[in-house]
Regions:
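N-terminal helicase ATP-binding lobe
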Residues: 1-420
């Protein structure tokens, strides 16, 4: 099977589908001789699909020489829980569409508060954790019980890097050496959203340098993905920058010539100052009045049939604002997302709030109030956005949730707008 057909099948579940053609850079990643150290492409052009499906194609469909040179485990390291859940759901969907079983491709989550077992599809609840015991090990089991199987390990940087350092968080210290060995051998490490990882980037670079220096079993390689990662962050004592520089892959001329890529690169996000201003006086004393005024401005700016996203810095302000929106009796559906929900409730609310396909273009639309839990990597595209000022890196991440598809202002769609 050629990669074009493989990619389309993974995306649609239909062999021979004519939609969802891969970008040229995605084809190069899947069919090239070796992988780069850096993947620098803008938001919205399919980095996750490029890496996961590229690795999977090399493991399952490529020539024998390429299969043997491709690590058995894909370790997908992320800085936030929300991104882990999103990536897990995408991987499960692609696995199902390709007709692969759990034995053929395990998908496992390493994240605080999650079961160590496998994940599977539930017809009504989507992705759910399947609790493991000795009696169900054959059905999937813990990922470390079957090191001979192909597997995708998705987790937060604290859980994954601590295991690679032989100090695994949230696990028995007697099993530290097992995960230490498995995560430093025969693995393709991928670190995404590196601008949010801090010293985790440097730690991962030093670990890769030690693997190269001390040797390992099988191929172990690390790929860092970010449009803003500096080369100096990857240079450590045991991982110096080569004389020729790090091998980097970015969009090609063919990619940039694509109409969909052009739409994303040229997406408009006009920014203006909101009438409602958060000041030292109304942070506490007049917090209720601030919520009332902001609610009125949101109601006036919201466009029917679209998504309005409001990102604030504190949970208490998000709650107050949500209460005011409820009192305003707007026709638009309203959702609140923050980190203090219980896991099961948060998963259900977030899935419903971020499902853009359920927004009726002829209906009243949707308003989502969120904290920084929605900042990075979350695949949602808002037409109207309100945001409170935050550190520059956070503002950049928040702006990435506005007009993410590049469709606002085109084909009769309302234009995008950002108010701060």
């Amino acid at each position: 099977m050629i990669y074009d057909e493989f990619f389309r099948t993974a995306m649609t579940g239909e062999v021979g589908s004519a939609s969802f053609a891969p970008y040229p850079y995605q084809i190069e990643l899947a069919t090239g001789e070796t992988w780069p150290e850096l993947l620098q492409v803008p938001t919205g052009v399919g980095k996750t699909a490029a890496v996961v499906l590229g690795w999977l194609y090399r493991r399952k469909c490529a020539a024998d020489e390429t299969r043997q040179a491709t690590p058995r485990r894909l370790v997908y390291c992320l800085p936030m829980r929300t991104l882990v859940e999103q990536t897990r759901d995408a991987c499960l969907s692609w696995r199902t569409n390709l007709g692969l079983s759990d034995e053929q491709l395990g998908v496992h989550v390493l994240m605080g508060g999650e079961d160590a077992g496998r994940w599977d599809e539930h017809p009504e609840r989507g992705a759910i954790a399947v609790k493991q015991s000795r009696h169900v090990a054959k059905a999937g089991g813990r990922w470390d019980e079957h090191p001979e199987r192909d597997a995708i390990l998705i987790g937060t940087q604290d859980m994954l890097l601590s295991r690679a350092l032989n100090r695994g968080y949230g696990m028995s210290r007697y099993r530290w050496p097992v995960h230490f060995g498995l995560l430093n051998n025969d693995c393709q490490w991928v670190l995404d959203e590196t601008q949010l990882m801090g010293v985790g980037v440097t730690t991962s670079a030093q670990l890769q340098g030690l693997r190269d220096k001390l040797g390992r079993c099988g191929v172990t390689h690390t790929l860092w993905m970010s449009a803003t990662l500096g080369n100096d962050q990857l240079a450590t004592v045991d991982h110096p920058q080569p004389d020729t520089g790090w091998k980097c892959q970015s969009l090609t001329k063919l990619d940039r010539a694509s109409e969909s890529v052009q739409r994303l690169l040229n997406a408009q996000k006009p920014i203006g100052k909101a009438s409602t201003i958060l000041t030292p006086d109304n942070v506490k004393k007049d917090a209720a009045q601030y919520a009332v005024e902001l609610c009125d401005e949101i109601a006036a700016a919201h466009r029917p049939g679209t998504l309005t996203l409001v990102v604030v810095n504190r949970v208490d302000r998000a709650r107050q604002l949500m209460q005011q929106l409820g009192k305003a009796k707007l026709d638009a559906a309203r959702f609140l997302i923050h980190s203090r929900f219980r896991p099961a409730e948060r998963a259900a609310i977030q899935a419903a709030a971020l499902d853009e396909s359920s927004i009726d273009a002829n209906g009243p639309g949707r308003i989502v109030v969120a904290t920084q839990a929605i900042e990075a990597g979350v695949d949602v595209s808002a037409t109207t956005m309100f945001l409170e000022l935050a550190p520059w890196s956070s503002c950049v991440q928040r702006l990435g949730r506005c007009n993410r598809r590049g469709t606002c202002g085109l084909n009769g769609n309302p234009a995008a707008r950002v108010l701060w």
